[in-house]
Amino acid sequence: WEDGRNILFKSSPVLNSHFEKEMNVLRDARLTRIGPGTDTKEVLVWNAQLVAAFIEVCQVFGRKEDLQSALDLITAIETHFNKGDQWLHQAQFSREPIGAFLDDFSALALAYIKLYLLTSDSTFKEKANKLLILICDEFAHPELALYQYRSKKADYLIAEKVEVMDSVMPSSNSILCEAFLWMGILKNKAEYTLNGRAMLSQILERAIAHPAYFANWLRIYSEWIEHPKALLKYAGDGEGLAGFDWCIDKDQLVCIPSDEIETYLLCVGDYCFAPVSTLQEVDKQLAELI
């Protein structure tokens, strides 16, 4: 029976011709299937995270076109996802508009923050601050330091829940936690910093026990608490910062534009050095950390 049939004894030309015939049968059968529908949803959180992605690419490669893509997209978001005084979860809807959820607001606030850090345009910082005020008013949980997924103004048919587990997308609360920590620095507002730290403390034990489900939380904890980078606030246009020869790796120093100081202010974690007026003095302060 095996004579001429066992594939181990067939020559390559014969075997390949049989294989092509079988593939054609499978291909013809596949073409008869109904194709899947195309997902054309335009969702606020996805677009806001793409803004942040464009900014990160710009920071890595230094391409101005990536920054322009981020600016164009944030303009489109403000045009299509904002109707009057309401932010929308989706740009298009069938009957009634769907109000934005916590992940939409959190991702948009963080996108504004990253735009401010890159452009020094204080308009973005104020827009982020306005969103955080709204979140505190409409999404705060009555008992936890975390925030509910839906607004208090939302349809009560939507289940109340607190989303904390990171998956393909970072959880809404972890994104918000990072936004609070950034805005605590940018606005010199201790309340925001305390909010972010309280959120971390409520999740940390679970995150350590199940790290695969809390990846973004653990990244934030590492970058902000366990191994914080040096944060340098500067006034003006930051002339001389880019080319200065620091005593530490540039990746460990984050330069932050500020319209609230007139000198340089270096902070690491909870500690801030005395304000100084030259980069050389900042470098001496950094040397004390080594």
PLM regions with names:
Residues 1-290:
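Glycan-recognition and catalytic cores of secretory/periplasmic carbohydrate-active enzymes
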